[in-house]
């Protein structure tokens, strides 16, 4: 838990459990985002892959056999009816996503772009494991890229972790957006 992680840092204990390493990995990835992601910075596929590698580093249960590499087979998403695209299509979809978030649009669309990118990444599900953690980090990075002040007052954890407060509702809203309709995507955008 977060409390255990904070205790381990304060008391100088070794981070010897998967759960503590998972929180430490997320903290490291957030530090990385805060170093590289400034307003207007380009987001690259390499950055996303690096976030994945950091997130799953040295994890047993929640790790990935190929940190930082796109998946090489089919995956299923727990608690979802969505079947992600074939792994052969992942590279092209990820390039399309990166092109979309880096496109020079009016700032009035920035929050909508964050919402759409969050959904699209989840829809693609590019990695074998760790996609949920990476999409929340990606969302954090995009908020910084678009100039939203998300680190005021210090941070304890990723502000996009609020998506986990009601996972059932989160998954239901993702499923609504999965239909690809204007109405479904608008409902998702309003939710985010």
Model-found features: residue ranges?
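FIC/Doc superfamily catalytic core
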Residues: 1-192
């Amino acid at each position: 838990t977060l409390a255990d992680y904070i205790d381990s840092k304060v008391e100088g204990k070794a981070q010897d459990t998967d759960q503590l390493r998972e929180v430490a990995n997320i903290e490291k990835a957030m530090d990385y985002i805060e170093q590289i992601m400034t307003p207007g910075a380009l987001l690259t596929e390499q950055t996303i892959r690096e976030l994945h590698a950091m997130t799953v580093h040295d994890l047993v249960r929640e790790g990935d056999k190929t940190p930082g590499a796109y998946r090489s087979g089919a995956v299923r998403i727990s608690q979802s009816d969505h079947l992600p695209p074939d792994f052969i299509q992942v590279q092209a979809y990820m390039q399309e996503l990166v092109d979309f978030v880096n496109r020079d649009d009016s700032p009035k669309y920035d929050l909508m772009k964050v919402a759409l990118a969050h959904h699209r990444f989840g829809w693609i599900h590019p990695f074998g494991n760790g996609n949920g953690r990476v999409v929340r980090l990606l969302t954090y990075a995009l908020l910084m890229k678009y100039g939203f002040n998300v680190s005021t007052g210090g941070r304890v954890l990723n502000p996009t972790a609020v998506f986990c407060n009601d996972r059932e509702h989160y998954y239901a809203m993702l499923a609504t957006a999965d239909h690809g309709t204007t109405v479904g995507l608008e409902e998702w955008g309003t939710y985010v």
